Amino acid sequence: VTEPAVSAQVTFRSSRGRWILLASILGSGLAGIDATVVNVALPSIGRDFGVGFDSLQWTITAYTLTLASLILLGGALGDSFGRRRIFVLGVIWFAVASLLCGLAPSAGALVGARALQGIGGALLTPGSLAMIQASFVPEDRARAIGAWSGLGGVATAIGPFLGGWLIGFASWRWVFLINAPLAVVVVLVAQRHVPETRDPAGSHRIDVLGAGLGVLGLGGLTYAIIAAPSHPISSAGVWLTGLVGVVSLVGFGVAERRQQHPMMPLTIFSSAQFSAANAVTFLVYGAFGGVFFLLAVQLQVVAGFSALAAGTALLPITVVMLLLSARGGQLAQRIGPRLPMSLGPLICAAGLLLMLRIGRHARYFTDVVPPVLVLGLGLALLVAPLTATVLAAIDSEHAGVASGVNNAVARAAGLIAVAALPAVVGLTGESYTHADVFLHGFRKAILICVVLLVLAAGLAASTISNSVLGSSTVGSSAAGPSTLGSSTAGAVVAGEVAAVAAASGGPGSTDRLHCAVDGPPLSVDVPARRDGA
């Protein structure tokens, strides 16, 4: 990250530093909250528009699709044309799209506006962290990033609660409309208090081809998966869009290999440890994406919870993560990542099995809290070692690239899970309005997600090397392991990966965050890649 002159950089305790933090946290919080808040609103949206379950899926996947496909591009645009400029553009874009969501006259219009929201999120999310990295003096940078990650994680975590409250006291439309006044505050603060930075050495040749093929590939596959259950198996539209998706993804791989400045450099997958850790990420976040999408509906349609009660259901995960994630990082530092990465998914799987108790007349403290607490325990053990392994598996100068790729993998996993899982378990059409039908499908979905987590545990046990982590990998930096715990909380609660992607916070650090793209939470100190990784 290109830094302004030393005299222009700010300290953590300075007034301007706090304004920069406010703009960054509120901005990233907009995207984080909107990734989680909508799950709680799905039954209300379905009732108002009288649509089937596939339309509700698109309400989620349209946002994730554009966000996952374009977030690396958004970071590159900020590097080249100014991080504050692209951040502010993203916030304005996001606010306008939010107004379109809140005023949408139909489900189709809402889905289109959600896709536009994802584009705004892809523009603002990378810049929120990059502005902090470039603006603060090196000795305060880790502390500032810790505040950003912790408060941003909390913002993401309260999304379902906020959504439930707004739905109960107003309307689901306010889930989106509330973004507009917040965006005005962010823009005013950013324009007045955040310095402009860019990378003068960065290339202005943006990988538009890669971004386009990524959107087309993920979009084609997502449409085919969601549309297949409601169309004949011989439907040309389904087969054609699926084929376009596959061909586009193949083309994406070819294009990224040939590009001089690729959006996703494929060479980093030459590390076996990096590839294995991302495979574990895909399985784990696929399971979480599917569960959290369906659980919010299950609690309302089957268990009879209000939107507010359903929104509070996952808050215990946040508490557990805040309290215990640092311990998971410390354990991985002492004994290596293999055991935490193997045991964590198994504990999460046990939590999901306990969710099978959530049915008709389920009670919050006896049927919902126990599985959620067990799930939080597994996540606290898993996430910090997983992300540290991703970063340690490649050379330290590519830490930002690795974080961005891991972020994209996690988002893509959730996207595919939300698209595919309901179809596999028979949740289509009006099934979300029939408690018995939805309960049956939910339980089958839980078992599938348990299988994914068991596969992730087996993959970690058989492929992850304990030697991949150096002594300074997890929790040894100025930010400390608490940074890992704070950021992880919000990320996992919603399936949104809110996190820290930071270079060393020590004096004289000049490490660069590639595109400043945030991924799942990572340690501030990243060791060089180990031989044989």
What are these regions (language model features)?
Residues 78-85, 141-144, 200-206, 262-265, ...:
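Interfacial helix-loop-helix linkers and transmembrane-helix boundary segments
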Residues 18-33, 38-40, 53, 128, ...:
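12-transmembrane solute porter fold
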Residues 1-16, 200, 463-533:
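Intrinsic disorder in cytosolic terminal tails and internal cytosolic loops
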Residues 2-192, 328, 335, 341, ...:
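Transmembrane-helix bundle of Major Facilitator Superfamily
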Residues 107-108, 171, 198-203, 228-234, ...:
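Membrane-interface helix caps and helix-loop-helix hairpins in membrane proteins
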Residues 187-210, 254-263, 461-471:
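Helix-loop junctions on the cytosolic side of multi-pass membrane transporters
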